[in-house]
Amino acid sequence: ELNFYKDQLKDKVIYCNCDDPSESAFTDFFKLNFDYLGIKKLICTRYQKSNLFTYADPVRRSGYRLEITAKNKNDKKPVKINLKEDGDFRSPECIELLKEADIVVTNPPFSLFREYIELLVKYNRQFIIVAPDSALHYKDIFKLIKSNKLWLGYGRVKEFIQSDGTIKKMGNVGWVTNL
């Protein structure tokens, strides 16, 4: 899907704010195609869920960000920068990164999809994101489609590679964008 947007991605700061950079196919794709796409910078943030063990340790409780630029794009292990907070896309720290971004590319949590789109619209960000088909029927999402502020991408998400290397089949997921 992303190859269809090569011209729009050129010289842009791309933000993947809902994908663990150590496991994300988006991170891998942008790192491998950094020069081909001509992107300026890639920012990825990781959400760190709180649990009994991470809550007691402030370092383990925080999420992290990964930034890839022309200078470090070939590094085998780019530097992970700890966030002050947990890396939730709604946190003030991640919203500041969102403001820096030109285009957001991610697979947001479907349970928070309305809230996620609302944030992108509020900050006037361009995006290419994975979405459940059911979201197209949400009243607030349908208004965006009707007013030509959001439309379907070129393709469908039929399957994706999970962090353990297995392939998960999908049948009800597609791309939405405002590019």
Range-by-range predicted roles:
Residues 1-179:
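Class I S-adenosyl-L-methionine-dependent methyltransferase catalytic core
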